[in-house]
Amino acid sequence: MQPIRYRTDLTPYNTFGLHAQARAFIALKHADELRDIVRLPEFDRDTVLWLGGGSNILLMQDYDGLVVHMENKGIREIARSDGMVLIEAQAGEIWHDFVLHTVALGLSGLENLSLIPGTVGASPVQNIGAYGVEAKDVIHSVRCFDLDTETFVTLSNADCRFAYRESLFKQEGKGRYVIVSVVFALKTHFVPNLGYGDLAAKVAELSAGREATAKDVSDAVSAIRNSKLPDPKVLGNVGSFFKNPVVSAEKAATLLQRHPDMPRYPQPDGSVKLAAGWLIDQCRLKGFQIGGAAVHDKQALVLVNKNNASANDVRQLAQHIKFTVFARFQVELHAEPNWLPTSFSL
């Protein structure tokens, strides 16, 4: 087990680059270390922060508790049959590196999720998604450490109760399950999913007349994301700041009467998903800035740390966007990242 560090600067551990310190900090290198970590005097189940890539958190103040940084690594094939491969990745693996690894192995299923920041362990929590694919579509099972019983358990896809940007790990299982690895069910035969946005055109450009591959899709997604989204290493951000709101069919119809060009995505249950970035853009908020926090000038869905932003700058900017969008469309936006502590949530 790694030594505990005290008063640790968390700026390098959150992609928005907010300044905060942890009262205590420890790096986890192997899942088995959890049995020892939960017995540390600094460990408090109610306050411990399990930290991955820090790409989905907003540190609003110093963290008065133990931070466990998940650094366990490893990828292995578990089984292969009937055109399907089960492959397990440890929670500390960098997500995009893992996606590229599976593509290089000739496996299909994760290519649409290329370049999403964060670690493998975060993928089930948020049920990450992009370009028509969600993590739930490819997750077979999730291996966790159950803090109730202090044993390792395996949860099936159904056990995880996935929904849009939701899962068991954000609801009833929050504070109980520590994700240590994820098993993905991937295909050996490439079946492209190109029905979202301008992905098909970019893939056609890259494949140049030949039959497209999973690598073409991964490269296309990466190129599109790089053209629209800032690199958090250069300009701090947490990716998409707001969830795409889901409204009733009646509400969507009313909005369409006033905004016939409004992007909308009908859902299986009859509701309609709207594009949060389009709503924000219609309010002419690109480039809008409060203190050091700003709406990105190319992608309205992304808030950036433009100039040493404070936590209060970020909160005020997010509030302004929520109020402005609601005033114009009567649609409520909800933030994707987790506010820490949660009392700061909008």
Curated annotation (Swiss-Prot):
Its main location: cytoplasm. It is found in: Cytoplasm. Pathway: Cell wall biogenesis; peptidoglycan biosynthesis. Keywords: Cell cycle, Cell division, Cell shape, Cell wall biogenesis/degradation, Cytoplasm, FAD, Flavoprotein, NADP, Oxidoreductase, Peptidoglycan synthesis. Pfam families: FAD_binding_4, MurB_C. GO terms for cellular component: cytosol. Signal peptide: none annotated. Belongs to the MurB family. Cell wall formation. This is UDP-N-acetylenolpyruvoylglucosamine reductase.
